[in-house]
Amino acid sequence: MSILEKIQEKQPLILNLANFVTPQRVADAISFAGGSPLMTAEISESETLVEIADAVVVNIGTISEKDYPLFLTICQLANQKHKPLILDPVAVNVPFRANFVKRLMQEVKFDIIRGNSAEIAWFADKESLNKGIDALESNLEVEHARVAAQKTGAVIIQTGKVDVISNGFEELFVETDSPLFKINVGCGDMLSAIVGTFAAVSDDLFKAAYEATEFFGESGVKATEQVENLPGNFVNRFLDKIYQATQEVI
């Protein structure tokens, strides 16, 4: 049974600490893929929600210092309860965010980290230019992904024109990029959510990370072909393609 088939059978619950820019898109991505999205911003319900969740996805896109106790508690509980823990380290090389993530990593282990080349370079202690959340570098930086995986112990998904998935010893590549991913804010957040959904039903997180990234990219390419040069129509068509793929395996 494929991972996508397992998602349709289990309908995993994905707990998200989402940013306040793209929560609807994140929830839609999980739901259209066959999972069940759940968001929280309340620390008092952390244990209950992590207990019932099948995976946890945390996104630092709009963090403030007051969020740290919630993030720490949720992440620690995910580790304690052996729930896959996925980090989306938005603009992590900005000092406040870097400090926030460093503090978290002293206390918890992330199972999968999904970011662009500049964000992944930070985990590898390498230099990489960035602009906001979009990496300027276009070269494939396989070494950064591998070193980041070795340093963090996480499976790394480095997204770009060619996506690199590394466990520190082996790399897999996905070459299904769409220019409309970059234009539509939140596509990276959606990918992290899809990764969490795949990880929730798989014992092999490296395989889950690869298959989620491939599934996401293929759906994006198909959607791009249909919207032509109308990027405002992309996300809706993209979600349609995700849903159609799930129906083909039922």
Swiss-Prot record:
Gene name tied to this protein: thiM
Protein name: Hydroxyethylthiazole kinase
Lineage, broadest ranks: Bacteria, Bacillati, Bacillota, Bacilli, Lactobacillales
Species name: Lactococcus lactis subsp. lactis (strain IL1403) (Streptococcus lactis)
GO molecular function: ATP binding; hydroxyethylthiazole kinase activity; magnesium ion binding
Domain of life: Bacteria
Record pathway: Cofactor biosynthesis; thiamine diphosphate biosynthesis; 4-methyl-5-(2-phosphoethyl)-thiazole from 5-(2-hydroxyethyl)-4-methylthiazole: step 1/1
The protein's required cofactors: Mg(2+)
GO biological process, one term: thiamine biosynthetic process
Signal sequence segment: none
Purpose of the protein: Catalyzes the phosphorylation of the hydroxyl group of 4-methyl-5-beta-hydroxyethylthiazole (THZ).
Protein family according to the UniProt entry: Belongs to the Thz kinase family.
